[in-house]
């Protein structure tokens, strides 16, 4: 489910700029098409990277993924910016470390791949490392509950990311999708310092002789 209204609101500042966009989970290519039209077609130096295996997942067992992949590839072929649409037909566990090792950074990242919490968390941590300052990270399906228990949904992972990265993110929107902006890190909290108290020496209750004996080697 793609929230075009929120995208238009929070991504408009990137239009016409040489942005780098990453999508984890391309599926039919609907978001890829939107990214191409709104960003790549407006700047010859803008690039899109899409990661997907088109092999399916536990929540999608009755879908023809060959047809889904073909739909995405058809969108790429028809795009005026097709030479700057880079498809990585790999799992995110393989593709994201590859991108990270190349030092590629992104202005916009959209995560909509595996819905399993541990997978979403893995993708998000790597993506945060590739997201530029003032870049935007979008999570899809925050409120998705098709599978039980909750560890098979994105929400626990997204909640964890918002908590862990709280000092360096701004929550732009939270609904079925969550949109975060990476900002300069805020001051990290420090341990509260107690007021200095006067130290008072108290006489030991151990007899002097015993103290002396206990220290004899």
Features from the language model and the residues they span:
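S-adenosylmethionine/decaboxylated-SAM
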Residues: 2-199, 203, 207, 211-217
């Amino acid at each position: 489910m793609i929230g075009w209204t929120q995208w238009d609101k929070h991504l408009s500042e990137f239009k016409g700029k040489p942005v780098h966009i990453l999508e984890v989970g391309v599926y039919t290519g609907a978001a890829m098409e939107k990214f191409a039209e709104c960003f790549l077609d407006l700047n010859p130096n803008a690039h899109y990277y899409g990661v997907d295996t088109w092999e399916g997942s536990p929540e999608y067992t009755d879908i023809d993924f060959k047809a889904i992949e073909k739909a995405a590839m058809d969108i790429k072929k028809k795009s005026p910016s097709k030479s700057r649409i880079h498809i990585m037909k790999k799992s995110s566990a393989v593709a994201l470390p590859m991108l990270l090792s190349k030092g590629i950074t992104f202005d916009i990242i959209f995560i909509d791949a595996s819905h399993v919490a541990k997978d979403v968390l893995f993708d998000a941590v790597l993506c945060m490392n590739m997201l530029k300052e003032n870049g935007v990270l979008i999570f899809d399906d925050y409120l998705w509950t098709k599978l039980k228990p909750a560890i098979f949904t994105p929400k626990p992972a997204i909640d964890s990311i918002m908590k862990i990265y709280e000092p360096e993110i701004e929550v732009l929107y939270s609904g079925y999708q969550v949109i975060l902006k990476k900002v300069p890190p805020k001051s990290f909290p420090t341990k509260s310092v107690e007021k200095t108290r006067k130290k008072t020496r108290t006489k030991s209750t151990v007899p002097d002789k015993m103290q002396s004996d206990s220290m004899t080697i």
